[in-house]
Amino acid sequence: MNDNVILTEKKDAVLLITINRPEKLNALNANVLDALKDTLEIFLKDDTLKGAIITGSGEKAFVAGADISGFLKGDRNMGADFAAKGQTLFSSIENASKPIIAAVNGFALGGGCELAMSCHFRIASENAKFGQPEINLGIIPGYGGTQRLTRLVGKGRAMELMMTGENIDAQEALRIGLVNHVCKQEDLLTLAETKMKTITSKSRVALTQIIIATNAADENPEEGMKTEALCFGKSFASDDMVEGVTAFLEKRKANFK
């Protein structure tokens, strides 16, 4: 689709989504964003798919940033539109009703770091590098980086990363909570698939409500608690709850559909 800038592979109930511009270190441009948006819509509509993994083509980069080759031709309105397009897509990933993991296989810089942060959690290879180097271009993160990075690692660390434009390695990203796991490059997809297999064996209803309720933690505490209560009610009234509780009482593994 769209010149094969996005590759997809279905593995059982999991969709592997690969950003495929290795010659450009998988940099994001309008074509990639459009193709990723189309892929996300297909994924969410397909009831046979329970989760997705996003990664980059090759061993050098997850996504090394946005393709800045056209920036000098733009103006303020173009910049705002460019940011809004990415923000809308990445918010759709963050709020997707199915779990999405980022398997970060190299450079995740600028828009690439922002894409990884929009996923529900991140697994990184040992050679991964993270950063928001936009300040070196005289701009700021525009795809939600100022917001998500702050929420993930705290205001002080986020300010430092964005103000210095410096990159951090996978171990530092793990230490500050930007990623959940670090592994060898050759083990990255295996680990991501193993985690996703565990996740997708759980209740679909509960997974969706966990995403909604956890994202509501970004609201004020009172509103977040209200959202959690509503989400708990939806899961409590589901067939999955009946199966889960029955299986527990019968001392067997739950069989969620």
Give the positions of each predicted feature:
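Conserved CoA-thioester-binding segment of acyl-CoA-metabolizing enzymes
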Residues: 1-55, 91
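C-terminal long alpha-helix characteristic of the crotonase
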Residues: 22, 123-128, 179-227, 233, ...
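Glycine- (often His-adjacent) and acidic-residue-rich active-site loop
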Residues: 45, 56-92, 108, 219-220
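CoA-thioester-processing core
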Residues: 89-95, 103, 109-163, 176, ...
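Well-ordered beta-strand positions
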Residues: 121, 160, 164-166, 172, ...
